[in-house]
């Protein structure tokens, strides 16, 4: 299972008023995703990036039956939950905690926050959706209380069907998230400057 391997950057946790949890994609690294921070309006944030064992949060597509991705998926969700609980113990309120993920990390980000919906600082998902062979509404509880959420994706995308992105946005909106969802025609499986600009405007603008 996943070891607790956390890389930090940005402001010291002891001094920061906000913290951003960053989740890398399949085959990526914590250092990798931390490099994205230089393009975001997060200069006064502490940055926390867990490293997935073997660089992968779960083995199969996020659209596979959930049991196929176990026990890795539960372990990955547990890693994120441990990070959040550690931050709360250090004095951060949940509305001071932000999340960002790309691809597999975006799926994990969305899955974690929607299973534990509350007022967070904000959420950014670059190409991702809720996990499972279908949406399981019974897995999700809580209320986002207008937490700003940005979801950007390509149509088509080789890993993430746009229909799942729409379904994910609807679940988040039902839980009172303030969702900005943008679908880019033929963008490819990547992060673009426009997505970064939109994420900065919608989520990292306080």
PLM features: residue spans?
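Serine-hydrolase catalytic machinery in alpha/beta-hydrolase-like enzymes
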Residues: 2-94
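Short alpha-helix in the alpha/beta-hydrolase fold that links the catalytic acid
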Residues: 33-36, 137, 161-171
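Active-site signature of alpha/beta-hydrolase-fold catalytic machinery across serine-
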Residues: 35, 111-115
